[in-house]
């Protein structure tokens, strides 16, 4: 797999306080990586480093030449007094044709939202629009900062299924940031546990049993994860992430989220 971004012994200090300590991280094409950690662990700072928005105190970051990064922020702040449709919001991302805007929305199952008021969207609808905006760049790397914030549980499952589908469709790398792993883990290739330094990293199965992860999140999180993996009813999804009628099935004894589909 081609390496898109490599962080080598990254350190970031704020007023003599070390926020990131000797971070080593590699993001490769086609992989979904989930960065987890409690509030204040340095996750947002690490995202800024990857996006090139945060200077380093020491260390080195290597980016593939010409890499395109699509970013979905944790929060979207809009001026409530200014009317803004989804279509107009997407046009703010650059010079794209009407067809390109419609295609981006179609890919995320949001084509029907094109004329909707941005201020009146639900949490899940907002995330789909933000994802569509990121896809307009045809990114090599998609960075999502707490993408499920403000989205209900079923909406989270649908959102992560959609991200997984888009990864398979475009072959891009995905970096997801979260403080809660009980849903995202089923769709992740690699997990990185952060508490200013990398506490542990590896496959979802190994991290769920790792002492550092259990110390950070507790056994209850692992139990919730196991329930999601083995007992939920899931649907096959089309490219937009919407369920295909008549193809629902129940998972009883296997985890289906860890295989890469080429």
Swiss-Prot record:
Gene Ontology molecular functions: ABC-type zinc transporter activity; ATP binding; ATP hydrolysis activity; ATPase-coupled transmembrane transporter activity
Enzyme Commission no: 7.2.2.20
Protein topology in the membrane: Peripheral membrane protein
Binding-site list for ATP: 37-44
Record field: catalytic activity: Zn(2+)(out) + ATP(in) + H2O(in) = Zn(2+)(in) + ADP(in) + phosphate(in) + H(+)(in)
Subcellular location: Cell inner membrane
Positions of the ABC transporter domain: 5-220
Name of one Pfam family that matches: ABC_tran
First-tier enzyme category under EC: translocase
GO CC terms in record: ATP-binding cassette (ABC) transporter complex
UniProt KW keywords: ATP-binding, Cell inner membrane, Cell membrane, Ion transport, Membrane, Nucleotide-binding, Translocase, Transport, Zinc, Zinc transport
GO annotation terms (biological process): response to zinc ion
SMART domains with a match to the protein in the record: AAA (SM00382)
NCBIfam families: PRK09544.1
Family membership: Belongs to the ABC transporter superfamily. Zinc importer (TC 3.A.1.15.5) family.
Reported function: Part of the ABC transporter complex ZnuABC involved in zinc import. Responsible for energy coupling to the transport system.
Subunit structure, as described in the record: The complex is composed of two ATP-binding proteins (ZnuC), two transmembrane proteins (ZnuB) and a solute-binding protein (ZnuA).
Protein name: Zinc import ATP-binding protein ZnuC
Species annotation: Vibrio cholerae serotype O1 (strain ATCC 39315 / El Tor Inaba N16961)
